[in-house]
Curated annotation (Swiss-Prot):
The lineage of its organism: Bacteria, Pseudomonadati, Pseudomonadota, Alphaproteobacteria, Acetobacterales. The keyword ATP-binding does not apply. This is Chaperone protein DnaJ. SMART domains: DnaJ. Zn(2+) 1 binds at residues 149, 152, 203, 206. It comes from Gluconobacter oxydans (strain 621H). It comes from the Bacteria. CXXCXGXG motif repeats lie at residues 149-156, 167-174, 189-196, 203-210. Its cofactor is Zn(2+).
Length: 380
């Protein structure tokens, strides 16, 4: 069986693309792969056919709604009731893919909770700063989704009195079954597209689906302590499913931006603090910023080396669903000056002359190094 293309991937657009975005993408791809521009190129010709097929479906709101919910199955005929319209083996069907659709079909609309039909789930990604992740934040996000049709109030019918009737093909189940080899496979009903209802006089706005495409602004409450990659589920905020069908869910994927000063590791925060070599040698007290916006003083003892770390308890990141906080770790980096005044050079030369070989004894790292050198020459 030939691999079926994803219409959105074929046009290189997102699943929430507007009609204008679809049109622009189609024109761009059509110009690129048009046979007149690629004479004798079979691959380009095949691609041109694919993008035309994709745009033909996605430019029609009714076809797009069916495709978003059921994929290519929405346009396959020959699916009658139990056992009807199928050949032997897996011919004319989605094969094992249909079985996996039943298991994992929630993300594209389907059934949950023991058979309850739902609209398609919607996925969005939201970027927040490290500070917003620390305090928590409410974000307003524009979501391209399908909502209950305002014209027919979700009935799908142009005549409110007539309404809809039980689908004669699936008898209201929204799906049909067929025996395929050893498997009993369920697929969306081709007559009602899974709604279980049919409309004699379809609404002119939604064409009988009971839903229409719309861009909505949704407020998302992001709690303090969320980590990069956190997924938040907002029940019932996904796509509407038409008459008698519960809406899907909205899944918000959180992306936490990196920070110029702080690096986060779970509930702990790390901050690199540069010191002059004189500060590290003599000892000092430095003020460092903390993630809640304040400052804390840190005592640096004399003789501090690059890489040494000092901990500030309770000054780290907020913990999700808790009032606790992690710790903050100050990582010291001793910097050597690259530009010296004449006086500074004189002082350092004087220091070096005064220190002499004793310098090695005063530095743990150097003393270890010179001890190893001495042992090497003495044959130890």
């Amino acid at each position: 069986m030939a691999t079926r293309i994803d219409y959105y991937e074929s046009l290189e657009v997102s699943r929430t693309a507007s009609q204008d975005e679809l049109k622009k993408a189609f024109r761009k791809q059509a110009m690129r792969y048009h046979p007149d521009r690629n004479p004798g190129d079979d691959a380009a010709e095949q691609k041109f056919k694919e993008i035309n097929e994709a745009y033909d479906v996605l430019k029609d709101e009714q076809k797009r709604a069916a495709y978003d919910r059921y994929g290519h199955d929405a346009f396959e005929g020959g699916m009658g009731g139990m056992g009807g319209g199928f050949g032997g083996g897996f011919a004319g069907a989605g094969g094992l893919g249909d079985i996996f659709d039943q298991m994992f079909g929630d993300m594209m609309g389907g059934r949950r909770d023991g058979g309850r039909r739902t609209g398609a789930d919607v996925q969005v990604q939201v970027e927040i700063t490290l500070m917003e992740a620390f305090t928590g934040v409410t974000k307003d996000v524009e979501v391209r989704t399908r909502v209950t049709c305002e014209a027919c109030h979700g009935s799908g019918s142009a005549d409110p009195k007539a309404g809809s009737s039980t689908c004669p093909t699936c008898h209201g189940a929204g799906k049909v079954r067929a025996q395929q080899g050893f498997f009993l496979v369920e697929r969306p009903c081709p007559t009602c597209h899974g709604s279980g209802r049919t409309v004699a006089n379809p609404c002119k706005v939604c064409h009988g689906t009971g839903t229409e495409a719309k861009t909505e602004t949704i407020s998302i409450d992001i709690p303090a302590g969320v980590e990069d990659g956190t997924r938040i589920r907002m029940a019932g905020k996904g796509e509407a499913g038409g008459e008698g069908v519960q809406p899907g869910d909205l899944y918000v994927h959180i992306s936490v931006l990196s920070h110029d000063i702080f690096q986060r590791d779970g509930a702990n925060i790390y901050c690199r603090v540069p010191l002059r070599m004189t500060q590290a040698a003599l000892g000092t007290e430095v003020e460092v910023p903390v993630v809640d916006g304040g400052r804390s003083k840190v005592r640096i003892p004399a003789g501090t080396q690059t890489g040494e770390t000092f901990r500030l308890r309770g000054k780290g990141f907020s913990v999700l669903r808790s009032s606790a906080r992690g710790d903050m770790y100050i990582q010291v980096s001793v910097e050597t000056p690259s530009h010296l005044t004449k006086r500074q050079r004189e002082l350092l030369e004087e220091f070096e002359k005064e220190a002499g070989d004793d310098h090695a004894k005063g530095s743990p790292e150097n003393s270890g190094f010179f001890a190893k050198v001495r042992d090497f020459f003495e044959g130890r």
